[in-house]
Amino acid sequence: MSVLSKAGSGFAILAASALVLSGCAAADDEAATTEETTSAAVESLALKIGTALPVTGNLAFLGPPEEAGVLLAQADINAAAAGIDLELVLGDSGDTDNKAYETEIPRLLNEGVSAIVGAASSGVSLQFIDQVTKEAGVIQISPANTSPTFTDYDDDGLYFRTAPSDVLQGEVLGNLLAADGHATVAMIVINDAYGTGLRDNATLAFEAAGGSVVSTPSYNVGDTNFTSQINEMLAEDPDAIVVLAFDETKTIVPALIDAGFSNSGLYFTDGNLADYSADFEAGLIEGSKGTLPGPPSDTISADFKERANALWTANGGEELTSWAYSTESYDAVVLLALAALAAGSTDSAEMAAKMSEVSGYTGGGTKCATFAECAEIINGGGVADYDGFSGGIALNEAGDPTETAIGIYQFDADNRPQTYLG
């Protein structure tokens, strides 16, 4: 049976999911008991995974696509009936201002989860990584953490991510700024591991290309007034400004443009590359550019989008307008399920020992693109090499993906990001 647990009122839109997914799984189980087969029945492992994704806080716009990806992965894994019976326990990571994680992480751990998917924010993940990996001995895997801090973090081999380090995104961003002909750049930076890490790596790349970073004022989570930071940047008369922010972007960007800065000189990153059609006046950021790890949204499988949207909206969610980190969230759950299947165990340490193998880093495996295909390989005694909806993954010894891409986007007249064609 497929089970979906939910936390509090924040997950009211998903209240029907347990019934919907359980019903589908029950039908599949009933069919399986009556179907004649020549292969031996696969005894299922009961795997419980928690999520700590941003339902609230300054990254709440990432919550819907990430949760939709997780829910779709659960549906596909349970529908395969190939040895994993997956239960989800949904939670809210919040942010470092509302600190939802302080109650949610203990709740998830008390549920006996083998792994927690989240957080999206690097700064938030750093608030509970020790609690999850070192103290509880549970796997933590993020679909969106990009801070370089995690590469060398002492996590007992239990931390993984399906999004690349900002060493890569910073390089792409810095090179984009230079390629666009900018000689001087300013950055407004959220003061956490994500913001400072991306600032540092973008600066390295931009300065290596001959540019100069002239101002990098920071702000703290919870701040609402950015006048001093804006004045500091504009005083340096930069060619371009990079906004390394989350939901605060909705305040920062209009203030910059009202102060006379050109929208064509604005740059966004994964923390704020979103649909602003309902937030900004039409055309406000037309021509602005941004970077986002993962496949360009217009290259994500139509089947993936249709099924994720159908699952999300059927349970009360609004139509998805962003696919940021949806595929990485899906792939994180599939990798956990494959690792459990390969290990023959839902023990966190035993699963962690199989993550590099099932993601293709150790080599020698057979390529597969779905949980069902990979499970067939594993159940047949082989080694699976999963390439998911986000592309190749290949998690190395540090838990970092080694096969990934960074997309470049440009905002249209409706303030929606579109794949940049050059």
Residue ranges and their predicted role:
Residues 18-23:
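C-terminal motif of bacterial Sec signal peptides marking the signal peptidase cleavage site
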